[in-house]
UniProtKB/Swiss-Prot annotation:
It comes from the Eukaryota. This is Estradiol 17 beta-dehydrogenase 5. Pfam families: Aldo_ket_red (PF00248). SUPFAM superfamilies: NAD(P)-linked oxidoreductase. It comes from Mus musculus (Mouse). The gene is Akr1c6. The record marks K84 as: Lowers pKa of active site Tyr. GO terms for biological process: negative regulation of mRNA splicing, via spliceosome; steroid biosynthetic process; steroid metabolic process. Substrate binds at H117.
């Protein structure tokens, strides 16, 4: 099945495929893997591809997209591609610079969706994680509304079809929504979301504002030491997911993905295994009962895998608020 048929309308009139392919990989994974996996994903039916400047793999992901266009598998307009502006490019004059760098790496003319990756500005420069001599991150003071105005200009210039945010809490979303002279509101908020962190309150708030929630780490997480607390439980080992997978004759990953789709959440599935990439497309082939949805809702433990703890002293750190 082609996931293109399964889309959600964004507030600006564009449509986003509800199943997306995530391309982030820990540093030790060779970048060439991103090309290979993205090609497999497109062949399997994925049409929504998610990356970011920070992932430093856009050259490889772009190569996969362009090769699948060249061999006739897809046209450019069949692909929904997301990139994100990193924290060191929050100054208004740098937002478009970051996007143009991404487009150059990708060798594409536009992105379908451009997001502010985190609501925290860091010192501009070559380093994605600028640190002082004591190894402490160096922050920058930029009003998120100024960054947003630069995002609006990227949309007006045709470099991004839609614009949104990622890792924002309710207060930070409201700040943009209440901005005087707001031209375009964020179409989505991409956040960590899975049965252990189901984001129920944030989802309700976003729904009330016609903002789509997009789930990353929907299968738990890659568990990379730099970002993830190693003592956190492995989501896909959860016995409830395990028994439900048996009941539906699916995998625990498919149960976790289907859970999001039935809540109206756009979900990113990340895998570099050909078998699992193809398997994840089965999410459209079955439906969870409302009772089982309730059971999954009750798994919530507010466990955040990507805690962002290295940024926790940033004045705009998003995860202190309840949601």
């Amino acid at each position: 099945m082609d996931s293109k048929q399964q889309t959600v309308r964004l507030s600006d009139g564009h449509f986003i495929p509800i199943l997306g392919f995530g391309t982030y990989a820990p540093q030790e994974v060779p970048k060439s893997k991103a090309t290979e996996a993205t090609k497999i994903a497109i062949d399997a039916g994925f049409r929504h591809i998610d990356s970011a400047s920070m992932y430093q793999n856009e050259k490889e992901v772009g190569l996969a997209i362009r090769s699948k266009i060249a061999d006739g598998t897809v046209k450019r307009e069949d692909i929904f591609y997301t990139s994100k502006v990193w924290c060191t490019f929050h100054r208004p004059e740098l937002v478009r610079v970051c996007l143009e760098q991404s487009l150059k790496q990708l060798q594409l003319d536009y992105v379908d969706l451009y997001l502010i990756h985190f609501p925290m500005a860091m010192k501009p420069g070559e380093n994605y994680l600028p640190k002082d001599e004591n190894g402490k991150l160096i922050y920058d003071a930029v009003d998120i509304c100024d960054t947003w105005e630069a995002m609006e200009k990227c949309k007006d210039a045709g470099l991004a079809k839609s614009i949104g945010v990622s890792n924002f809490n309710r207060r930070q979303l409201e700040k943009i929504l209440k901005k005087p002279g707001l031209k375009y509101k964020p179409v989505c908020n991409q956040v960590e979301c899975h049965p252990y962190l189901n984001q129920g309150k944030l989802l309700d708030f976003c729904r009330s504002k016609d903002i789509v929630l997009v789930a990353y780490s929907a299968l738990g997480s890659h568990r990379e030491k730099q970002w993830v607390d190693q003592s956190s439980p492995v989501l896909l080992d959860n016995p409830v997911l395990g028994s439900m997978a048996k009941k539906y004759n699916r995998t625990p990953a498919l149960i976790a993905l289907r859970y999001q789709l039935q809540r109206g959440v756009v979900v990113l599935a990340k895998s570099f295994s050909e078998k699992r990439i193809k398997e994840n497309m089965q999410v459209f082939e079955f439906q969870l009962t409302s009772e089982d949805m309730k059971v999954l809702d009750d798994l919530n433990k507010n466990i955040r895998y990507i805690s962002g703890s290295s940024f926790k002293d940033h004045p705009d750190f998003p995860f202190w608020d309840e949601y």
